Amino acid sequence: MGESQSKQESNTRVAQHGSQQDVDPTFQTKRALERERSSPQVEQSFLGQLQSLLGWSSTSKDVPLSQLIREMDHESRRHSHQSKKKLDRSEHISEGTIPEIYEKRKETISHTQSMEQKYLFQNFTKLLLLQKCCPGGSEKLVRESWHPCVPEEGGHMIEIQDLFDPNLDTEKKPQLVIIEGAAGIGKSTLARQVKRAWEEGQLYRDRFQHVFFFSCRELAQCKQLSLAELIAQGQEVLTAPTRQILSRPEKLLFILDGIDEPAWVLEDQNPELCVHWSQAQPVHTLLGSLLGKSILPEASLMLTARTTALQKLIPSLGQPHRVEVLGFSEFERKDYFYKYFAKERNTIIDFNLIGSIPVLLTLCEVPWVCWLLCTCLEKQMQQGEVLSLTSQTTTALCLKYLSLTIPGQHLSTQLRTLCSLAAEGICQRRTLFSKSDLCKQGLAEDAIATFLKIGVLQRQPSSLSYSFAHLCLQEFFAAMSYILEDSEEARGDMGNDRTVETLVERYGRQNLFEAPTVRFLLGLLNTREMREMENIFACKFPWKTKLKLLRSIVGEPFCQPCHLGLFHCLYENQEEELLTETMLCFPLTASGPNHMEATVFQTNVKRLVIQTDMELMVVTFCITFSHVRSLRLKGKGQQEYKLTAPAMVLYRWTPISEASWKVLFSNLKCTRNLEELDLSGNPLSYSAVRSLCTALRQPGCRLKTLWLVDCGLTSRCCSFLASMLSAHSRLAELDLRLNDLGDNGVRQLCEGLRNPACNLSILRLDQASLSEQVITELRALETKNPKLFISSTWMSHMTMPTENTDGEESLTSSKQQQQQSGDKHMEPLGTDDDFWGPSGPVSTEVVDRERNLYRVRLPMAGSYHCPSTGLHFVVTRAVTIEIGFCAWSQFLHETPLQHSHMVAGPLFDIKAEHGAVTAVCLPHFVSLQEGKVDSSLFHVAHFQDHGMVLETPARVEPHFAVLENPSFSPMGVLLRMIPAVGHFIPITSITLIYYRLYLEDITFHLYLVPNDCTIRKAIDEEELKFQFVRINKPPPVDALYVGSRYIVSSSKEVEILPKELELCYRSPRESQLFSEIYVGNIGSGINLQLTDKKYMNLIWEALLKPGDLRPALPRMASAPKDAPALLHFVDQHREQLVARVTSVDPLLDKLHGLVLSEEDYETVRAEATNQDKMRKLFRGSRSWSWDCKDHFYQALKETHPHLIMDLLEKSGGVSVRL
């Protein structure tokens, strides 16, 4: 009892510091940090028990737990410091030099005298801080739940000293910093740390002369204040006269903590009507004027608020720095436990709760939950109970806290009254209560004293008011009040409806499931938790009424698809019946334009941005009850696979903790419908792989496909994988590429593959780095098991010297080289597709012909233009750019934009190093020269991971739109249509003519299409399948109109079917319209013409001559599926052949009439040198069939036998069909 009393007094002192109203883990654990450690042997005994509780591996007696924490969680700690910047050494510091102090601080919990110093960085409770990025000029069309700024790259992690650093885009120092985050995540803690750091001379001394901290819940108690009175309240001791303080407003910082808590509307007022700083005015008006910059416009502000409150609270605050608090890293969670319990070193306790720790560690990323858990453990120790931590949810933990702190059931009536007080305060947005408020509610004096003593309530000495220990605790009590209401009077469905209406009125439909009260309410409606409530309140609840209330809350119209808040609520509830019923009815596709704010325009694939371990845990938990068949946790740089629908893709930009991996894989033990899991690009530790393989061995796991590309796996992980393969009968496909498994690891995999229980049919791994012996083993396995296919498409795992940006030689890992060099099967394109830059043409490589994926390496800074595609890049340094040809139908289908916008150019999927490209010119085919199209109607559509964004280009030129400082994703130009104009948009078009010879008969195909390189390429490939060859002729000179029809005619009597062509846009994946023209004898040539059907004016004419045609090509044999990846001999040795063929004319003579037409023959011969002739010859070889290249090879053998023999010996074979 004495210790409890001491702790209550300590809590009171905490409340007095900086007007603290919430439970602050920083202050709760500071005592333990500052206390001298004595008797290391006894301490080690206690800490040994603690590490058992936390699931940490044992260590030798001479190693302190602080060191163990540092060593075992180095990766988590490293990440929490990855964005750390050096402090400005010019800061004025009153007590020593910060950089020296900071650098001396080790990544551990020191047991030395230094812990007694009051330097900030030695007693900070570290929080993960994410600075959000909101790209300017972007109009977000899609958001999941409400992410007011879904960053393209997730923002970046920062430290507390970076809060007021200049914006990366504008280089301007922010005047407004918004600290946002979930309930209990540590926003107020951070705000108080900033104030205390400034007071102690640790932060911002060079920028701010005065820092004022205000608790908005206390300010709301004041009806009117003058600016002078506000400043006086914001300082414990007034350091200067008000007039002097206000003389330099740019040196002032106002911290407004919990600005979303009071029920006020912050209204700005006309600057001309602003009163003098000594005159009083309504508080909400005063604060509104500060925010609106009507008064002290040069001053800086820091606000804290829950993320869900920002949208309606402050709709127009310009461009603030937005920083989201993500809670504790895993290291800091364990660190917190150590600090909290360090004072208990004289207590010997048996901990036996290892099994539930991963879930609890994940819940404890929220500092308030950390405090709650530690308080429960402490109460159990004080009461001599056997420690029991079976709680899987925050709701269960709160009930455990109540059962441990409420002294018997005699307080149940007063506890009900306290719940009513909490609910009334939540509805009225009140968190401070006077003594009379408590008495009016029915709380007795002795009950108030008891609640203060056990820490549920706390007194505010400055205002003589009371509050709950934390706002989350008040919201928990409010949730209990809704349960208790119905137990007193069975109101049935009407009571349920009234409860739901009250919740909607308080939180709004948009944010209903984000509200902690609603989450607690769903958690309390769990069967187990309701029984716990019955024990606490000594009553029985009407179960049927509770079930109806449950369904009315999660039912329509409030339930939003893929809403993170709903996932949280379902996780808190944990009822399998409700989870299955809700998730199986979960809409996975957009049902119309009204869902544009909540869904993504890609059917059957849902995308969610998750920022924390907690969000990952609740989402994966709920997914296992849904129809989702494929789950991807997107990592960086991973290869994309096509997922089986319905699918879900989760995006996260912060590392995943070990505890979270364990929880995620635990959820996979019973997957119901989930069959595919893609973790590629996410680093997996040894213990994470062990947890994954343990889950895969469970009978309830139905995963059939597992992608682990570039997950940092080593040979040490292969024993778990092999054991899983031997035991898991469902896994059919496993991808382990870009992992350093080595010979030993692959041998272990072979053992698993030999097991008769293994049903794996596809295994992908890197074979180039393996020894011949291991490769032989793999081939033997394939031979023995015909169903097993082992594939590899990546380069060798070797470390080779490369040159870094400073000109120094460095070692590049095999994985980096694979990402830089790509696939070993590369084909050089002809010069028609080259990028022309400062140093001349730069060749483009084919990475994957089937996927239309290409790569170009731009060697230096400058401007590069590709005439074939119309793309233009301006780069600041050497950079490799990947370009994929896409189809609009794949992305734009079934979106509202298909009715309001028209496609205006090709769609490209471009990837480049961030910051290397300062401008990109995207081609469009809308004709601006007609003067009928306003350039402001042009937009660039970005199809990003989290949805689609429309961006306004910097300028629009006749043939392209310019984006400056672009971010890349599938992107292309759209034109907003005006109803009055309709389809009468002038466009630039092209004609494509193809022919095929059969004896003397000729068949032509004539196309009229928009000038889109992706359409042209699709037509080229389709015609080549039927041995049609393109003839290049000039396009129409004038702009044409979509929907117009044109008559096809000829100067000779020929067969034309159909005789009309309509100019229309069709996706490259669709069949294009063409006219087929049959000519019996071309003679000296024919004229083809296109005439506008409506106005009968000639719009295009071309003369086709015999010299345009080549003899009939040999028929191509059917190639195997892997033929596109197989290079012909002449393509493999292109560079050698160009350099070493010394006699070209005899070679041309052998190709003349078989491969080369008369015109081609003369064109090649006209080049000046042998090298130029060979380059010209290879340029034309792009359209050759495999058989034509065989003819080329035979001609080379006859004219240059020694050269061919030399190349054959070096290559070990020849890729030809004989």
Curated annotation (Swiss-Prot):
Region (UPA): 969-1118
Record-annotated site: Trigger for autolytic processing: H942
Region feature Disordered, mapped onto this chain: 1-44, 71-91, 799-842
Domain CARD, residue spans: 1122-1211
Listed SUPFAM superfamilies: DEATH domain, P-loop containing nucleoside triphosphate hydrolases, RNI-like
One Pfam family from the record: NACHT
Chain ranges of the NACHT domain: 175-484
Documented activity regulation: Activated by pathogens and other damage-associated signals: activation promotes ubiquitination and degradation of the N-terminal part, releasing the cleaved C-terminal part of the protein (NACHT, LRR and PYD domains-containing protein 1a, C-terminus), which polymerizes and forms the Nlrp1a inflammasome. Nlrp1a inflammasome is inhibited by DPP8 and DPP9, which sequester the C-terminal fragment of Nlrp1a (NACHT, LRR and PYD domains-containing protein 1a, C-terminus) in a ternary complex, thereby preventing Nlrp1a oligomerization and activation.
PROSITE patterns: CARD, FIIND, NACHT
Subunit structure comment from the entry: Interacts (via LRR repeats) with BCL2 and BCL2L1 (via the loop between motifs BH4 and BH3). Interacts with NOD2; this interaction is enhanced in the presence of muramyl dipeptide (MDP) and increases IL1B release. Interacts with EIF2AK2/PKR; this interaction requires EIF2AK2 activity, is accompanied by EIF2AK2 autophosphorylation and promotes inflammasome assembly in response to danger-associated signals. Interacts with MEFV; this interaction targets Nlrp1a to degradation by autophagy, hence preventing excessive IL1B- and IL18-mediated inflammation.
Protein name as annotated: NACHT, LRR and PYD domains-containing protein 1a allele 5
